[in-house]
Amino acid sequence: HSVYVDQWDWEKVIRREDRTLDTLKRTAQEIVDCICDVSVRLNREYSSIHTRLCREMSAITAQELEDMYPDIPGGSQRENKYLEQHKTALIMQIGGKLRSGKPHDGRAPDYDDWALNGDILFWCDWLGCAMEVSSMGIRVDPAALDRQLTLSHHDERRDLPYHKALLNGELPLTIGGGIGQSRISMLLLGKAHIGEVQASIWDDETVSACEKAGVTLL
């Protein structure tokens, strides 16, 4: 991110029977399909754009990823290893501690259900690493919020208006997420730095490094 963060946030009301990993994966695939559709159209209309994205999304849990790469210590490093082969993936169930005793990545306890959330990532050949474009998930219901507040040692939030209403079952069940606008632009245009698609403020070190790499900052 730069100092300016731009993203689309969305939220959709669902039924209790929709609080499943299948719903999560199906929704994530719809987002991937939309991004890939735009990429195909851009490549067709602009001869200078040659980005190729993989529409086939692989879904894997954070625990499965740790089991697959036990010698790789960090979540982002395991993501890169996996995405290098699978190109497009949904990394699911982020927030709780894995069997190693460490979480894959941090997540707020009062947002997504840690058992029903995920990150959408694409592999970027021009960067040699994975890029996360969306963090999403089925939101906490009363049981999940109760559990996650205790696990994260944030029981003091229970008396806040939002938390109290949710714990009392007064709010609808939803799925939602955020989609990084500038990250999508970088992905579709094959750009190496967020400053190529977004006008912002950069320190001298970043400006110098980009000049040496031939990266034009807006």
What do these predicted regions represent?
Residues 1-15, 163-164:
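Residues forming anionic-ligand binding surfaces in small-molecule and nucleic-acid pockets
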Residues 7, 21, 28, 159-160, ...:
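Alpha-helix initiation and N-capping motif
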Residues 14-22:
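Inter-helical turn/loop segments and adjacent helix faces that build the functional surface
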Residues 23-42:
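Compact, glycine/acidic-enriched structural inserts
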Residues 27-33, 48-57, 215-218:
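Noncatalytic linker/hinge segments flanking ATPase motor cores
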Residues 36-74:
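Alpha-helical scaffold segments that mediate packing/assembly in large oligomeric complexes
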Residues 62-218:
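A translation/RNA-centric and nucleic-acid-associated enzymatic feature enriched
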